[in-house]
Amino acid sequence: MKVTLSALDTSESSFTPLVVIELAQDVKEETKEWLKNRIIAKKKDGGAQLLFRPLLNKYEQETLENQNLYLVGASKIRMLLGAEAVGLVKECNDNTMRAFTYRTRQNFKGFDDNNDDFLTMAECQFIIKHELENLRAKDEKMIPGYPQAKLYPGKSLLRRLLTSGIVIQVFPLHDSEALKKLEDTWYTRFALKYQPIDSIRGYFGETIALYFGFLEYFTFALIPMAVIGLPYYLFVWEDYDKYVIFASFNLIWSTVILELWKRGCANMTYRWGTLLMKRKFEEPRPGFHGVLGINSITGKEEPLYPSYKRQLRIYLVSLPFVCLCLYFSLYVMMIYFDMEVWALGLHENSGSEWTSVLLYVPSIIYAIVIEIMNRLYRYAAEFLTSWENHRLESAYQNHLILKVLVFNFLNCFASLFYIAFVLKDMKLLRQSLATLLITSQILNQIMESFLPYWLQRKHGVRVKRKVQALKADIDATLYEQVILEKEMGTYLGTFDDYLELFLQFGYVSLFSCVYPLAAAFAVLNNFTEVNSDALKMCRVFKRPFSEPSANIGVWQLAFETMSVISVVTNCALIGMSPQVNAVFPESKADLILIVVAVEHALLALKFILAFAIPDKPRHIQMKLARLEFESLEALKQQQMKLVTENLKEEPMESGKEKAT
């Protein structure tokens, strides 16, 4: 029997809460009632057909401080039909991956009518988020109770409620039992081990699981570099000609690990089903604004903003501002070099142990200033990118990433390039590289994990005391959980985490022939990073909504670009070494030609390796080709069925015409 959404029951008074909606304190009752009715209404009537109830009943709201918090869930059948609507891909009994449909649910591995574990909690929360975001305005002209909050047919109600300040936030709840199991296998025991990536994916979703998978992969990939770099550092410190072998290995290593990651990523995302998920049509991002008009593609009414105005904002405001920030970064760099000269002069005059320690102070101060500048610039870049008024979220993210990467690259590495190619002081280069790398790692650990964790612990203690003081007859556990989680910080995505790895990759690869110990420090940091990031996700931030991902996106290109730049810098550094210069004492032109030739040969080798190593393993390519073939065959059969039905109808119509 075919089950439709209209047949589902939405009157369950008790259900498993998955998502919390927080409304503003002064929201009017008619607005609350309207929102509730739209959420629980049947799909055919324009509702989401979800389960919805307040955290506190009327008596509890009178007894306690009314927080305007509401819980959202869904019945099992509603979840399964929602999984079909969002296009979730699951493993079938024949070990193939296919888009889930409720009609063929028995064909999927692990499905049972009495089993509630077929969909992960992250998938269930993603489905609820999808349904809430797809609540559309119908014939309403405004939000009830708020005449200034205009509504337009077909536009998302949730986005309008958020931008109007009526809805404060929407967030998924943690599952305490599942979270405890995940913590026990993930980070509670500090040890050299693989992470439970599939469990992370089941709890947090594919985007976060891919980050932790990449962090783990990158850390283990650094171990050969660290093992080889350690003896080079200890035994051949000044023999730059011997670093040629190490640098060449580094360049091949950086190419191979990035290509092998793409294969490993394809394996994971195929197993999770996200490699097969179709890309959906993007709607305007919440912050997009413009004059109301008709979209020429969708035919729907939405805000329109001329492209030339956006380009003017980018080239006349954003670009000059970025250039000004880059200039300021270079100015700060020159102040740092003045401090280095001052510290060196002081040490040469006195030669004491105190002044030998003082030699590292300018680099430490500069590293701290770099971190501060990076964070301040990030806020400015977000403001500018939002002001540019990009229509799509993907365009917004691409412009933001470009701004941040350019500034961070120059801010972090400009001083090292200046020391290497202008001052040509290899000793100072090693010292600066080591100090910048280690200081930035320590600061990131403190600012991103330990400080937020300490603040969250203090807040948690206050909430527990408040709940223990309550005399009301309520579900104290759920109440405490919701109150605690709503005050947690919001996880803003994997942007900063990937950026940290990107800069670390730069420190390791750009100047490997000068400081081979960088990989060892990166490995030590990343083992700590895995645990601190896990703690951050589980105990510091709100649980983020799951976001399906097939790869790490634009960051793959960023890492590949960094590996290409590292070829140029390492070849140039080796060409500048005294040992190599001694081979060409008279003709510098010959030296330059040979260095350029070697650099081109290594770049050619990189591109050959990248081409020779397929992005997807052979067995996955075969499975994808098979699925594409079956989809085309199914489409042909459907078309043939329609043609056959039309041919059957034609004789009947012609017979009627003859009879008349």
From Swiss-Prot:
It is found in: Cell membrane. The keyword Membrane applies. GO terms for biological process: chloride transmembrane transport; monoatomic ion transmembrane transport. The term 'anoctamin' was coined because these channels are anion selective and have eight (OCT) transmembrane segments. There is some dissatisfaction in the field with the Ano nomenclature because it is not certain that all the members of this family are anion channels or have the 8-transmembrane topology. Keywords: Cell membrane, Disease variant, Membrane, Neurodegeneration, Transmembrane, Transmembrane helix. Highly expressed in the brain. Intermediate levels in the retina and heart and low levels in the placenta, liver, lung, duodenum, kidney, testis and spleen. In brain areas, highest expression in the frontal and occipital cortices and in the cerebellum. Lower expression in the fetal brain than in the adult brain. This is Anoctamin-10. Belongs to the anoctamin family. GO terms for molecular function: calcium-activated cation channel activity; chloride channel activity; intracellularly calcium-gated chloride channel activity. The keyword Disulfide bond does not apply. Does not exhibit calcium-activated chloride channel (CaCC) activity. Can inhibit the activity of ANO1. Coiled coil: none annotated. It comes from the Eukaryota. Residues 1-207, 262-316, 374-400, 522-553, 612-660 are cytoplasmic. GO terms for cellular component: cilium; intracellular membrane-bounded organelle; membrane; plasma membrane. It is linked to Spinocerebellar ataxia, autosomal recessive, 10: A form of spinocerebellar ataxia, a clinically and genetically heterogeneous group of cerebellar disorders. Patients show progressive incoordination of gait and often poor coordination of hands, speech and eye movements, due to degeneration of the cerebellum with variable involvement of the brainstem and spinal cord. SCAR10 is characterized by onset in the teenage or young adult years of gait and limb ataxia, dysarthria, and nystagmus associated with marked cerebellar atrophy on brain imaging.
